[in-house]
Amino acid sequence: MPITPQQALQRTIEHREIFHDEMVDLMRQIMRGEVSDAMVSAILTGLRVKKETIGEIAGAATVMREFSRRVEVTDRCHMVDIVGTGGDGSHTFNISTCAMFVAAAGGAKVAKHGNRSVSSKSGSADALEALGAVIELQPEQVAASLAQTGIGFMYAPVHHPAMKVVAPVRREMGVRTIFNILGPLTNPACSPNILMGVFHPDLVGIQARVLQELGAERALVVWGRDGMDELSLGAGTLVGELRDGQVHEYEVHPEDFGIAMSASRNLKVADAAESRAMLLQVLDNVPGPALDIVALNAGAALYVAGVADSIADGIVRARQVLADGSARACLDAYVAFTQQATAQG
C-alpha cells in the first residue's frame, strides 16, 4: 500500500526513514498535485530537520526523472554534466558555466542542467543569457545543439514542468529543501558522468552514493573547505569519486596540480554583467585566479568524462584549449546555434 502524506510526515517527526519505494510513491503524489501545500511544506521541513537519507534522495530523484521532458541522445560517450547545488553563498562568477565551454572544447560533450541564480549573483541561465544565448530550447533543439556544438544547456523549468506544483511552496518557505539536492541529480539527457558541487561536506559522500544507486557511471562530488560548491583555489576540496561501481572519498589541493592558492573573494562579482566580463576574460586566456579555477574544474570534468586519464591531465588539456582559442570559439558557436535554432522556430 502506498504511504500516505500523513504517514510520511509522522516518520520524519520520529526521525525514521521513508524507504525508497515509499518515497517514490510519495513523490508521485506530490508531483501530480495530490498533496496539499501545507502538507508538502511540513514534509519538506521534516525531511530537512531529520536529514534526508540516500534512499529518500534516490527515490525522489527517480520520480523527478520520470516526470521530466527528456533529451534523447544516442551517443553518450564522453558526456558529462557540470553542475552545483548552489546555496554556497559565495557570489562568485559562473565557474561551472565557463568550465562547460572549456570541457567541450577539450573533447567532452557537456549536457548541462541549470537554472537561474541560487547562490551566485548570476546563475548559469542568467550567465548564458548575458552572453547572448537563448536558453529556453526544446528537448530536440538541445539534442541538436549537443551534437553540433558539444554543448546542450537544459533550462530546468522547460524540462521539469511538474515542478510548478511545488514552486509556490518552495518560494514561500525560502529555505533549502530536498529539491535543492535533487536538481543536479535529474539531468534530462541522463548524462552518465557528472561533476557536482555541493553546499555541505556531508553531501559529498551522500550524493556520490545516490548517484551510484541511480546508475551513474562516473562522478566527482566536490565541496571546497572554504564553502565553495566547486573545486576550490582557496582551500582543500573534499571529493567523493564514483568509479567502477565504488565510491572513494579523498581530498585535493590546488598545489597538487601546480596551481597557486587564491581566496574566493578574488572571484566575486556584483551582478550578471560582471560575471559575463570575468567569464570572457577567462575564455580569452587572461591569466589570474579566475583562469586557474576554471582550468581546475574543466580538468576535473574532462577526467570524469573519460577524456583525460587524471585531473592533472585534464588541466593540461583545459589550458591548451584556452590558449589556442578553442574554448572561446566553442562559446561563439553555441550562442550562434541557439539564436539560429530559435529564429527557425
Curated annotation (Swiss-Prot):
A biological-process GO annotation: L-tryptophan biosynthetic process
Catalytic EC class: transferase
Reactions listed under catalytic activity: N-(5-phospho-beta-D-ribosyl)anthranilate + diphosphate = 5-phospho-alpha-D-ribose 1-diphosphate + anthranilate
Cofactor: Mg(2+)
Chain residues that bind anthranilate 2: 170
Keyword field: Amino-acid biosynthesis, Aromatic amino acid biosynthesis, Glycosyltransferase, Magnesium, Metal-binding, Transferase, Tryptophan biosynthesis
Gene3D superfamilies cross-referenced by the UniProt entry: Nucleoside phosphorylase/phosphoribosyltransferase catalytic domain, Transferase, Pyrimidine Nucleoside Phosphorylase, Chain C
The protein's assembly and partners: Homodimer.
Protein name (record): Anthranilate phosphoribosyltransferase
Cofactor-binding details, from the entry: Binds 2 magnesium ions per monomer.
Gene that encodes it: trpD
HAMAP family: TrpD (MF_00211)
Entry binding sites for Mg(2+) 2: 229-230
Coiled coil: none
Single Gene Ontology MF annotation: magnesium ion binding
Keyword Transferase among record annotations: yes
Binding residue positions for 5-phospho-alpha-D-ribose 1-diphosphate: 84, 87-88, 92, 94-97, 112-120, 124
GO cellular component labels: cytosol
Protein's pathway: Amino-acid biosynthesis; L-tryptophan biosynthesis; L-tryptophan from chorismate: step 2/5
Chain's role: Catalyzes the transfer of the phosphoribosyl group of 5-phosphorylribose-1-pyrophosphate (PRPP) to anthranilate to yield N-(5'-phosphoribosyl)-anthranilate (PRA).
